[in-house]
Amino acid sequence: MDKFRVQGPTTLQGEVTISGAKNAALPILFAALLAEEPVEIQNVPKLKDVDTSMKLLSQLGAKVERNGSVHIDASQVNVFCAPYDLVKTMRASIWALGPLVARFGQGQVSLPGGCTIGARPVDLHITGLEQLGATIKLEEGYVKASVEGRLKGAHIVMDKVSVGATVTIMCAATLAEGTTIIENAAREPEIVDTANFLVTLGAKIAGQGTDRITIEGVERLGGGVYRVLPDRIETGTFLVAAAISRGKILCRNAQPDTLDAVLAKLRDAGADIEVGEDWISLDMHGKRPKAVNVRTAPHPAFPTDMQAQFTLLNLVAEGTGFITETVFENRFMHVPELSRMGARAEIESNTVICHGIETLSGAQVMATDLRASASLVLAGCIAEGTTIVDRIYHIDRGYERIEDKLRALGANIERVKGE
């Protein structure tokens, strides 16, 4: 297994170009199964999960090529089962189910894998498809969906806000007969991006970005060209990297309006931030950040995917900060690892109390999930001495060339190939 060796401390400064959003690219790739004509998707990040998704689409019979953009022709799809060997590594594969049953009347997906963060069940996906008229069976570790004729539009009130289930229902409803209304829908920018992609193909969707999405079903979707929005979590991660190292950064190909809650907290921490149409700059003027209180919640509140990075920020900030996690359970697995580097923190229920210290010390630490692992790499950049981050396959699932981008900012980081 590969590791990162990071030598610190360094002040990170310079420019970074932000990649396309993983959390938009994945649902968009699966939504391409709905299209009867070729689709070109631009700004798709080069990530393990993206490669797995493309491989899965190929196994279903789609023609998939990558030459800068990703080209998908799903006109010849003739396999309707997403097998365990691919699905086990990635939760996003559940997104194949809605398009398959909507367009072909049948679909099977093995129960998914991915990061082990708390209870992330597929119940809401299943309930939503059932309300659209699909028959669902759970057999031999597979979710099997089928429908006679077309799915039927429905008024769906979601029990809780779920990005994944909103995507599944919205995709399936595009080809349903009649109108579907999703109440208590997720409002994330990646939901908006997926909806806008579907509209490019001929879907009729309104209300994306609000908690009420209306989809008027159409008989078929055509092809089109679409550009994935910039990754707000990658952007936030690099902004935090500069903030904790008392540095200065310019993020290009960013989308500032997707990061309001994060930018507000960085300003509270003492960062000088400016934004343009497609860029964000942060300057700490050599100062140590101030501790901030953060509470995660669905968009437009503070994103859970930035929680680990802000936990780290608080652990090296002036003062004491409280981080409360309301979205996922069991999402403080990075805290014991950061404690190995000298961090002072206590976990009380769903809150971590961070007591800021001046400097961390290098140590051997282990990545446990995608965002937690990013916080450990950043910690290594500012810690005294050498930090070894193990199990970095988690990082490769969500960050494109993170070591190259950090190196360009002055970090002393190298990938050590595993046995």
UniProtKB/Swiss-Prot annotation:
**Cell compartment(s), UniProt:** Cytoplasm
Q: Which reaction does it catalyse?
A: phosphoenolpyruvate + UDP-N-acetyl-alpha-D-glucosamine = UDP-N-acetyl-3-O-(1-carboxyvinyl)-alpha-D-glucosamine + phosphate
Please classify the protein's predominant subcellular localization into one broad category.
Answer: cytoplasm
Q: Name one GO biological process term.
A: peptidoglycan biosynthetic process
Give the first-level EC class, as a single word.
Answer: transferase
Superkingdom of the source?
A: Bacteria
Listed GO CC annotations: cytoplasm
- SUPFAM superfamilies, per this entry? EPT/RTPC-like (SSF55205)
Establish whether keyword Thylakoid is in the entry.
Answer: no
Under which EC number(s) is this enzyme classified?
A: 2.5.1.7
Protein family according to the UniProt entry: Belongs to the EPSP synthase family. MurA subfamily.
Q: What is this protein called?
A: UDP-N-acetylglucosamine 1-carboxyvinyltransferase
Organism lineage reads as: Bacteria, Pseudomonadati, Pseudomonadota, Gammaproteobacteria, Enterobacterales
